[in-house]
Amino acid sequence: MAENQYYGTGRRKSSAARVFIKPGTGNIVINKRSLEVYFGRPTARMVVNQPLELVEMTDKLDLYITVSGGGISGQAGAIRHGITRALMQYDESLRPALRAAGYVTRDARCVERKKVGLRKARRKPQFSKR
């Protein structure tokens, strides 16, 4: 592994991403596939690029990412969180800008569990008057 490599772990919903950053040309590899191949949806690609665009480093860093668990939006959010943490390790002066954009905070929202006696998490069984 390279000496000048920076690491960040990101999580969102049930997804976890490991992000490795090193100086390069803006190449992004996710699970051995390119960003365009891995995320067909443009919104997911946009979410992944948000922290890099904010600090204007889209073509200065190479990213190697492994992500597992969850779906498309959860994985994209986990990658964004991981990239943010790796960028802060790379340069601590980026933290205020990333914090102001809201990328540093882990999004704690996740699926609410189903309760006994209910049909879903909050959906009550149909009420019959007679």
Curated annotation (Swiss-Prot):
Transmembrane domains' residue ranges: none
Name of the protein in its database record: Small ribosomal subunit protein uS9
A GO molecular function held by the record: RNA binding
Organism from which the protein derives: Aliivibrio fischeri (strain ATCC 700601 / ES114)
Keyword Ribonucleoprotein: yes
PANTHER family per UniProt: RIBOSOMAL PROTEIN S9, SMALL RIBOSOMAL SUBUNIT PROTEIN US9M
Pfam families recorded: Ribosomal_S9
GO cellular component: a single term: cytosolic small ribosomal subunit
Disulfide bridge map: none
GO biological process, one term: translation
Family according to the record: Belongs to the universal ribosomal protein uS9 family.
Underlying gene: rpsI
PROSITE patterns documented for this protein: RIBOSOMAL_S9
Keywords associated with the record: Ribonucleoprotein, Ribosomal protein
NCBIfam families: PRK00132.1
